[in-house]
Regions:
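Catalytic-loop of the protein kinase fold
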Residues: 257-268, 273
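Conserved hydrophobic alpha-helix
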Residues: 252-256
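ATP-binding glycine-rich loop module of kinase domains
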Residues: 155, 161-193
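Non-catalytic terminal and connector segments of soluble metabolic enzymes
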Residues: 1-151, 158
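Conserved structural core of kinase catalytic domains
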Residues: 204-246
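C-lobe/activation-segment region of protein kinase-like
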Residues: 274-378
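A conserved alpha-helical element in kinase catalytic cores
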Residues: 179-212, 240, 244
Length: 382
């Protein structure tokens, strides 16, 4: 169901690692096929007049064959989600390539539906290609099969595309959460396993029950929303936070720094408040040591979790698209979310913090709500 062939034109094929990395962020790359002259002609013909590349982009150069992780049996909404995921991957790849060059139409073309993907493979000039790809699709399904009975899928629309998450019925632990990573995302699996092990003593880190070669099993937590004040208009899933939650996150970041670690993608979207276990940070894929960048950790007040990576280093990591991170390392520390500047969060609570926090959060809420209504009105007036 999730098989797709991306066609990369000459303009965007050097370096080829860039479009491949964009596609691999959300889909499993199965095969990369550099086209010979007859293959380029055949692929251009298969694309058809309405989907050929503009002259500035050049002729088809390379096929990148990719696949989404096969859906869980009985998932009636899988086809819609897979199509939306492939569209999102294509848009992410386009934006990635536009960073360094002027935009020229869409930078890739891609097939829609498995039949179209197989048709494209048939014209690539490699008689064994189709069989190799189908074998790898089957292997991908086997590797990414959740190893315990699934109660229901969780986080199906996550923009990360690196793992599947399910509520499962474990034979020993009962209801628990299994997160299984696809083969192309093993770096993220290793990061998360390392973080859950190194930070197991931290109250905000979910309890790791067990793990396998590419999966993690954690305690199931419910969410009563106690850490939330209100959702921010225009930022789906990002809520303003209560002061106790923000202080707990600032302390968590301080602990990370003391252990030579920093974290990106610390967002309100990744938080739950369990009535018994308290506040938890669900996603730890972007916990990393400073030594990865061969740098001496900065002073605690300048920790990257608070302040973000230096610009000269940010290009060395495929960062998630993070909202509300201008001037801060993570959105939980943005004034629109926390209500206080990071300097105030890192110091002891002071008189006047409460009214200032409330006023700042309300100000941001009103500004974003007004801006959203204005944007809608302007669109309707066109």
């Amino acid at each position: 169901m999730g098989l797709c062939v991306f066609v990369v034109p000459e303009r965007w094929a050097v370096p080829l690692s860039e479009p491949v990395a964009g596609i691999a962020r959300g889909l499993e790359v199965l095969e990369i096929v550099r086209l010979d002259a007859p293959g380029r002609t055949a692929v251009a013909r298969r694309l058809g007049p309405g989907r050929r590349f503009p002259p500035a982009a050049g002729a088809p150069h390379t096929l990148v064959v990719a696949c989404d992780v096969p859906p869980v049996p009985g998932d009636g909404d899988a086809a819609r989600r897979v199509a939306r995921r492939i569209d999102a991957v294509a848009w992410h790849t386009t934006r990635r390539l536009w960073r360094d060059r002027p935009p020229v139409d869409d930078v890739v073309r891609y097939t829609v539906g498995p039949e179209a993907a197989l048709d494209m493979l048939n014209v690539a000039g490699d008689a064994a290609l189709r069989d190799r790809v189908l074998e790898r699709v089957e292997t991908l399904g086997d590797v990414c099969t959740i190893p315990f009975p699934v109660i229901r899928m969780l986080g199906a629309d996550s923009p990360g595309f690196r793992a599947r998450v399910a509520l499962v019925d474990h034979p020993q632990y009962g209801r628990s959460v299994c997160k299984i990573f696809r083969p192309g995302a093993m770096e993220f699996y290793r990061r998360e396993l390392s973080a859950r092990t190194l930070l197991a003593d931290q109250p905000l880190v979910p309890h790791l029950l067990d793990h396998g070669p590419n999966w993690l099993l954690t305690t199931e937590y419910t969410d009563d929303g106690a850490h939330r004040v209100r959702p921010l208009p225009g930022f789906g899933g990002i809520d303003q936070l209560r002061p106790w939650a923000t202080r707990a996150l600032a302390e968590f970041a301080r602990t990370l720094h003391s252990r030579g670690l920093f974290m990106l993608d610390l967002s309100p979207q990744n938080l739950v408040s369990d009535p018994t276990a308290g506040l938890k940070v669900l996603d730890l894929e972007f916990v990393m040591p400073y030594t990865n960048f061969e740098v001496t950790p900065p002073p605690a007040q300048s920790a990257w979790t608070y302040r973000s990576l230096p610009a000269e280093l940010a290009a060395n990591i495929d960062l998630p698209r993070l909202a509300l991170t201008r001037g801060v390392g993570n959105s939980v520390f943005h004034p629109a979310v926390a209500g206080l500047p990071i300097e105030r969060l890192l110091g002891p609570a002071r008189r006047g913090d409460g009214p200032r926090r409330v006023a700042t959060q309300l100000g941001w809420y009103a500004a974003l709500a007004t801006g959203g209504r204005l944007h809608t009105a302007l669109r309707r007036g066109r």
